[in-house]
From Swiss-Prot:
<keyword id="KW-0150">Chloroplast</keyword>
<keyword id="KW-0444">Lipid biosynthesis</keyword>
<dbReference type="Pfam" id="PF00550">
    <property type="entry name" value="PP-binding"/>
</dbReference>
<comment type="pathway">
    <text>Lipid metabolism; fatty acid biosynthesis.</text>
</comment>
<keyword id="KW-0276">Fatty acid metabolism</keyword>
<keyword id="KW-0597">Phosphoprotein</keyword>
<dbReference type="InterPro" id="IPR006162">
    <property type="entry name" value="Ppantetheine_attach_site"/>
</dbReference>
<keyword id="KW-0596">Phosphopantetheine</keyword>
<comment type="similarity">
    <text>Belongs to the acyl carrier protein (ACP) family.</text>
</comment>
<feature type="domain" description="Carrier">
    <location>
        <begin position="57"/>
        <end position="132"/>
    </location>
</feature>
<keyword id="KW-0443">Lipid metabolism</keyword>
<feature type="transit peptide" description="Chloroplast">
    <location>
        <begin position="1"/>
        <end position="53"/>
    </location>
</feature>
<comment type="function">
    <text>Carrier of the growing fatty acid chain in fatty acid biosynthesis.</text>
</comment>
<keyword id="KW-0934">Plastid</keyword>
<dbReference type="GO" id="GO:0000036">
    <property type="term" value="F:acyl carrier activity"/>
</dbReference>
<protein>
    <recommendedName>
        <fullName>Acyl carrier protein 2, chloroplastic</fullName>
    </recommendedName>
</protein>
<dbReference type="InterPro" id="IPR003231">
    <property type="entry name" value="ACP"/>
</dbReference>
Length: 137
């Protein structure tokens, strides 16, 4: 019978979060936490937890709206950062059209290689933030 790993938790606090956007505790964009201990099924193992929060909520909202428009979804459709394009009914052509809409809206150019890695709304929003940062916006 397999035994589960003991639970552990991590708490991150910021003393100066009043000037930051709601929901953000610092200006950090990512945190990596290496963990090494017994894992599930009583096997020794190590893994790394990476929390990546690049895109601003406003960017995610804009991407959600563009996705709804490109896929002709009703305004009350449940589209969020975790929404997969394929689960929303998008095929490869729809995804290309979504990327073109994002390029137009945000004034960016997405390389084909990067466009192929976009699976979710959050992926798209993170890529947009990264490209806009490179562009100097």
């Amino acid at each position: 019978m397999a035994s589960a790993a003991p639970a552990s938790s991590i708490c991150i606090k910021s003393a100066s979060c009043s000037a930051l956007a709601p929901g953000r505790i610092s200006s950090l964009r990512s945190v990596s936490l290496p963990v090494s201990r017994k894992s599930f099924f009583s096997r020794r193992g190590s893994f790394s937890l990476r929390v990546n929060c690049q895109a601003k909520p406003e960017t995610v909202t804009k991407v959600c709206n563009i996705v709804k428009k490109q896929l002709a979804l009703p305004d009350d459709s449940d589209v969020s950062g975790v929404s997969k394009f394929s689960a929303l009914g998008a095929d490869s052509l729809d995804t290309v059209e979504i990327v073109m809409g994002l390029e137009e809206e945000f004034g960016i150019s997405v390389e084909e290689e990067s466009a192929q890695s976009i699976q979710t709304v959050q992926d798209a929003a993170d890529l947009i933030e990264k490209l806009m940062e490179k562009k100097g916006h």
